[in-house]
Amino acid sequence: MGGFLTGTTDIFYWALMIFAIGQIKILQYKFKNLGKHALALMDKSKMSSDEAVNHCMKKCIILHQIIINYVTDVDDLMKPLMLMDFAICSMLISVVGIQVIVSGFGIAQVSSLQYLSSIMGQLFLFYWHANEIILESLDVSIAIWEGQVYSYPLNVQKSLQFVMLRAQKPLTLNVGPFYAMSTTTALSVLQAAYSYVALMRQAYS
């Protein structure tokens, strides 16, 4: 029962993260094709070129702000869970490592390693999706530039420059108040755990 609840909770959180990644990709597409969308809007309405571009830009900026608020809300929701998972995973790595050092490798350690590998796989899925959110949010500014921002009216260019500046600050999901989740920090966690186990091995040898 506990495993089922844990699995469904994890899937729910992964879905929240994948949704954020998808929305950022949609935003990139809209920024990259801002001129095309403005032309399509001009064909459907009586707007001038400048009005159409300005209208499409405002919709993109609103979507960007919605995504920022959404990721912030998801981060607030996940922070305690990620902190708890980090603590459990770190403790398990240390315990299993010490067991192997003190008692040798046996059946008990095999089951512990199996559980540990599932916990680590779970954590890496969280860290990988969080890393994708970081990378995709940074790519928003690239998408704006690829949309030929310099060809738009001056007021639109200035507004898009502010968006590009905001996009330089990546959207992150964090482990409690400590650090942002990414593949780099995931490897750092493993390195720290390995260092602790290596230290314990030295102490027991």
Question: Where are the predicted features?
Answer:
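Membrane-embedded alpha-helical segments and the immediately adjacent membrane-proximal loops
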Residues: 1-205
